[in-house]
């Protein structure tokens, strides 16, 4: 994250909450987020980049992948169920994005130390294909 102000943090919290409300909607992307926040697309892109140093697509992917990690760590869902719950219509694409972000496939989550906080190894993919 960049040198963010309290306003940036508040904005990012609002964004994250809005994304989480629409998590299962695979069609929820940049335009839908801008509409939900009553902002222009260009203003949203600029503010997100300033507040997080990520693109809007990357931020949406990051929220989806982190929620996916939470669901996998709970142990009550398989990878395919989690992929669909966090807005990926393709399980294989979820696995690809997860592996790029965390450095290991989602099937290994249960085998890893559950007390250790997962550390992303790369920024989330900016391509919002599912």
What are these regions (language model features)?
Residues 1-13, 35, 50-58, 62:
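Short, Lys/Arg-enriched, Trp-marked, Pro/Gly-tolerant hinge/linker segments that flank
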Residues 1-25, 110-130:
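Inter-domain helical "communication" segments and dimerization helices
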Residues 6-9, 28, 42, 77:
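Conserved catalytic/ATP-binding subdomain
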Residues 16-28, 48, 52, 69-78, ...:
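Basic, amphipathic alpha-helical hairpins
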Residues 50-89, 111-130:
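Terminal helix-turn-helix DNA-binding modules in bacterial transcription factors
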């Amino acid at each position: 994250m960049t040198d963010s102000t309290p306003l940036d943090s508040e904005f990012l919290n609002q964004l994250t909450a809005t994304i989480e409300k629409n998590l299962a909607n695979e069609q929820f992307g940049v335009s839908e987020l801008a509409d939900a926040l009553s902002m222009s697309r260009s203003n949203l892109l600029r503010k997100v980049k300033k507040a997080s140093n990520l693109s809007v697509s990357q931020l949406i992917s990051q929220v989806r992948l982190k929620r996916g990690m939470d669901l996998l760590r709970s142990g009550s869902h398989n990878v395919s169920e989690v992929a669909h719950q966090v807005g990926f219509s393709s399980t294989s694409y979820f696995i690809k994005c997860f592996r790029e972000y965390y450095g290991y496939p989602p099937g290994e989550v249960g085998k890893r130390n559950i007390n250790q906080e997962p550390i992303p190894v790369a920024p989330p993919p900016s391509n919002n294909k599912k």
